[in-house]
Amino acid sequence: RSTQGYSSAASDVYKRQAEGMKEDKESWRSFFVWLKERGLTGVRLIIGDKNLGMLETIPEVFPDARYQRCTVHFYRNIFSVTPRNKMKAVAMMLKAIHAQESKEAAREKARQVAEKLKEMKLSSAAKKLQDGIEETLTYMDFPTQHWTRIRTNNTIERLNREIKRRTKAIGAFPDGQSALMLVCARLRHVAGTQWGTRRYMNMEHLSKLEDDLLSDIIAG
């Protein structure tokens, strides 16, 4: 089980990996509590796939955090009930939703796409879209400069694929701790050579947005 986070400086990247075989609520709760015990605070947004164990745990451990469903995982879920010969057209329609410049516009676009899917005899795809679209739009409440960075968890997915490739090449491990040591070694390498040399997001945009919201509340 892994998580990746960014500090207020946005040049500090935190990657945490722990051995875990289950995706239930208790496993996620133990993982999140472990992160807090190691000093994690001020979590504002958690990005992930539609994992019920994680979703049930977030309000308990990180009550101030918002949840953003990864748009890529959301698309894949809709593709699971879409005929292969219609996937390209459906993909273009889905991307158009998240290309909108406001949450209201995205909601309206999603409504239009759902109607179009029904016309295409893709009622199951339309239902998945209608049922899940709202939790994919959380990123739109954050600075527009951050949108492309926080609507998916592609960064951690790529890293997880790399870790899987390396562990598969080795084969069997004597125990879970041995595998975890290999994973952590790879994470240290990536953090030191890639993440440590670039700024992932300019967090000044988020600070300004929060200041503006606070001013509106005081004035209102």
Predicted features and spans:
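Conserved structured core elements
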Residues: K22-R29, G48, L52, S123, ...
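A general structural motif
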Residues: T41-V43
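A generic short alpha-helical patch detector that favors 3-5-residue windows
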Residues: G20-D24, I46, Y67-C70, T82-K86, ...
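Single conserved hydrophobic/aromatic residue that forms the stacking wall/gate
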Residues: R1-Y14
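Acidic/histidine-rich catalytic cores and adjacent linkers
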Residues: A96-G220
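Short, conserved catalytic/metal-binding motifs centered on acidic residues
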Residues: D12, I46-D49, C70-H73, L129, ...
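Conserved beta-strand -> loop -> alpha-helix junction used to position metal-binding or nucleic-acid-contacting
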Residues: L45-L52, T57-M93
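Active-site beta-loop-alpha junctions of metal-dependent nucleic acid enzymes
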Residues: Q17-G39
